[in-house]
A protein has these predicted regions:
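A SIS-like phosphosugar-recognition module
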Residues: 1-115
Length: 115
């Protein structure tokens, strides 16, 4: 997560997670990265996006449809969304590591102090 690896007050989330707590923290200061999948849950993803558009200033949307998931048969492409999102998140956090000069394995506490 970007909280762990980059010490950023931000997280990737999908609508199932968002509406079980994080949306109560939505404001103009927190960054959210919404992962929009396909399939039955997309309706909830769209609701989350509508909420973010209304109440947040800082958010990014990673939409599987915009990334070409429709090249995979519609009956199964929702099962490939997590793999697509993972690959995207690896590229994104690697880019952040370089831009922010903050190595992904740098930790304050994990493996450093006893807890």
């Amino acid at each position: 997560s970007l909280q762990e690896m980059q010490w950023m007050d931000c997280c990737y989330l999908h609508s199932g997670e968002y509406f079980h707590g994080p949306f109560e923290c939505t404001d103009e200061d927190h960054l959210y990265i919404l992962l929009m999948g396909t399939g039955a849950a997309r309706v909830m993803d769209e609701r989350a996006l509508t909420f973010l558009e209304k109440y947040a200033k800082k958010y990014e949307v990673i939409d599987a449809k915009e990334l070409g998931i429709d090249a995979i048969d519609e009956s199964v492409n929702e099962y490939f969304c997590p793999m697509l999102f993972y690959a995207m998140s690896v590229a994104y956090r690697t880019g952040l590591q370089d831009k922010r000069r903050h190595p992904l394995d740098m930790r304050r506490y994990m493996g450093v102090v006893e807890y």
